[in-house]
């Protein structure tokens, strides 16, 4: 799967924020707007110049610095946006750019020469890399993750003279502080993130092509993945370890309940059902909620298997009042067959539970939804695929 392909997407789409940022940096360079965005402490006293604390990252005055920033956006920025989500990626980038500007101005005010006066996006790249390289989902390479930001800092100093060294160092230190939890109070909560992603604008951008808004993996607004009939991934993806903050400075870690080993939790079998419920494994409370959902899924599967064992001894028929037409239409719009959707709804009574059964391929029943109670519809049985 390519880095810019969202799970379950039918066509390739580029991450929206990183791609638009590349266009913006290029346009500002062509317009010669770099000097007017320079982080100059002497100009920040004017009210209309405060924007430089944030917009200093968008301007460039040296071509090597611009090319290096543009090169890192598709190689590093796309990966970060796909794994953080577009909204959280924009939020983290904005917070780190502003914090870097404030730290540079503070050092310049203390008399440290060269701490400010430059511009460029490289300090934000360093800050994002320093914070994201400690994330559990970061690809394991030969080099240790903590060494990557320092190598990028040395490479930037060799290839470009912009921004100044101290401004680059401010960006790297800001990222390390972010990874340590210094900005945890500025993090987007899961509720606020869900509200933003469920807005009309975000929903519209999530359907766009070739630039697409990526939802935060594991968030409540992310629907489970559906595959066409007969198409299944070779190896299931591990569930996302979602938490209130995507970077690893949470206070606690998930623990298993007493007398329950990790082998008893079939996370792979119920992966998409847990994703639909938006379960978060970052605390013990959410772990118990996930366990309750897991036990419910196992009970539903056992009840369906009991129906398949009876076979020809009893026939399955679904009266129409037992199946909600609105919920059935929702499943039909997702692309599920009507007969299987009706059986899953009758077994669970909830759309999310029915989606979980259908996605896992546990419903293989041909049933008919009847108008009354007098004409039963025979089925071929239910079993695990």
UniProtKB/Swiss-Prot annotation:
GO biological processes: liver development; MAPK cascade; negative regulation of natural killer cell activation; positive regulation of protein catabolic process; regulation of acute inflammatory response; regulation of protein secretion; response to xenobiotic stimulus
UniProt membrane topology term: Multi-pass membrane protein
Main location: membrane
Transmembrane segments: 13-33, 58-78, 95-115, 146-166, 168-188
One Pfam family this sequence matches: UBA
The UBA domain, residue ranges: 322-361
Compartments where found: Membrane
Protein name (record): Rhomboid domain-containing protein 3
Keywords: Membrane, Transmembrane, Transmembrane helix
Span list, region Disordered: 238-264
Keyword Transmembrane: yes
Originating species: Mus musculus (Mouse)
Cellular component GO terms held in the UniProt record: membrane
Coiled-coil regions listed: none
GO molecular function, one term: serine-type endopeptidase activity
